[in-house]
């Protein structure tokens, strides 16, 4: 990763000076400032209603910052899952889902708060259904990985520490036209529903969550898909 990177934050507001410690704690990677390296994706994220939004543009200096890249081959999709369920609001509806949550947190957890910056997939609400289905033993880990790749969710870059905020400089902003980007956002959600039905109904001989628990599968198991950004 380059030392200087351009990042974008989609919002209903122009954010010239992001505030450290502000935001929602139950986002994918906990409290932080959520951005992407794609201006187009930021514009889509900015348009959640009929109102236009903004893609706020920043230049982030990564020198001296510790970066956790959950999309690298060092981590598996279950590391990503463990981080996700530790931060997003997840209420297990079945005994297997409760056991799955505990097992993943105990065996695949990654401390994102130990880093200045976190890079990894964004699990929007449409694709969170896949994570829920996996925890409830409805799809395999291979099907989960396939869904994440097909979804093209885009990677997000999250500023976690005060130092990261200090090394982030506002450049400018661009208007996100809701007439263009809101339909794109809705189309992504509709595609997620289509993918979910197709993948969940397909046959798979892979690993279900119950197999992972019973087999005491760990993070170094070669059967667990890695580097899901490829």
Regions found by a protein language model. Give the residues of each.
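Short, flexible loop/turn elements at secondary-structure junctions
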Residues: 12-13, 39, 62-64
């Amino acid at each position: 990763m380059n030392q200087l990177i351009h990042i974008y934050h989609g919002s209903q507001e122009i954010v010239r000076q992001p505030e450290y410690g502000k935001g929602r704690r139950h986002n994918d990677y906990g409290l932080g400032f959520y951005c992407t390296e794609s201006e187009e994706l930021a514009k889509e994220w900015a348009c959640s209603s009929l109102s236009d939004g903004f893609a706020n543009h920043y230049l982030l200096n990564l020198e001296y910052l510790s970066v956790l890249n959950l999309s690298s081959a060092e981590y598996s999709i279950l590391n990503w899952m463990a981080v996700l369920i530790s931060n997003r609001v997840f209420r297990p509806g079945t005994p297997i889902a409760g056991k799955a949550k505990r097992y993943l947190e105990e065996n695949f957890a990654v401390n994102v708060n130990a880093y200045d910056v976190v890079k990894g997939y964004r699990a929007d609400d449409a694709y969170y259904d896949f994570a829920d289905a996996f925890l409830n033993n409805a799809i395999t880990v291979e099907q989960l990985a396939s869904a994440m790749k097909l979804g093209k969710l885009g990677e997000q870059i999250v500023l976690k520490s005060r130092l990261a905020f200090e090394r982030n400089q506002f450049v400018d902003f661009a208007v996100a036209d809701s007439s263009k980007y809101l339909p794109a956002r809705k189309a992504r959600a509709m595609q997620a529903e289509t993918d979910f039905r197709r993948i969940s109904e397909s046959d798979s001989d892979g690993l279900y969550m119950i197999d992972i628990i019973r087999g005491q599968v760990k993070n170094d198991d070669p059967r667990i898909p890695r580097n899901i950004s490829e």
